[in-house]
Amino acid sequence: MEKNLFELLEKGIASIDSTLCTDKVISRLRRLYDEITLFNPSYGLVNAEGRDLVIRHILDCLAPVSIICSSGKEGSRLADLGSGSGLPGLVLASALEGWDISLVERMGRRAGFLRNTVAAMGMSQNVKVIQKDLSEVQESYDIITFRAFRQFKDIISDLDRILVPGGKVFAYKSSEENIQEELETVSSYSGCRFSSEVRDYDVPMLDAKRRMLVLFKD
């Protein structure tokens, strides 16, 4: 990572939460940036590089960490669906010390990338990669996250199946996405009852509103 991008990353982390601006967190996210940059040309992980990768992806994934953190604690089980490039799963894992995190990714090459990157970031102890489609996942989780994944109408029953009672789903959304349609899917679901709310959050140095769609399993 070039010096100017490192300084940008450090500034962004401090703006989100000064307590996260530690050598360990910064080093992990810097390594994630380097791994994505190295493998992106071959794997097509994310359509961004340089400053855009730092702000629109890494910092965007980190920005709502306090919203997620307030719903769990050390030892909480979190599943990140469609992890692909590690966004947001590996970004969150860098900050959520002591959480038990599973990165769910069905594609072999991307699952391999995730395994290598978990090891490179020094997080093998509490982060594992599950190379399966969501429909095949059998474990249960306290918290589920995803970003740029499938629509709720395609996954709502699986979310219900693997989320414990009292658990929460955090779906990263841009302001342009049709959140109302997603909420209608949730309200019409005939399985368990989900409560929902939409939380806005800001990303440092990004002049665009971002939103988090939160589901609570009653």
Residue map of PLM features:
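Class I SAM-dependent transferase core
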Residues: 1-75, 79, 109-122
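Residue-level signal for inorganic ion chemistry
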Residues: 36, 92, 173, 215
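Conserved SAM/SAH cofactor-binding pocket of Class I
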Residues: 62-146
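Short alpha-helical
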Residues: 108-109, 136, 150-154, 177-178
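A short SAM/SAH-binding and catalytic strip from SAM-dependent methyltransferases
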Residues: 142-155, 173-175
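A short glycine-rich, Lys/Arg-flanked "PGG" loop and its adjoining helix->strand segment in the class I
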Residues: 156-166
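A short hydrophobic/small-residue beta-strand
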Residues: 169-170
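Active-site capping/gating segments
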Residues: 174-218
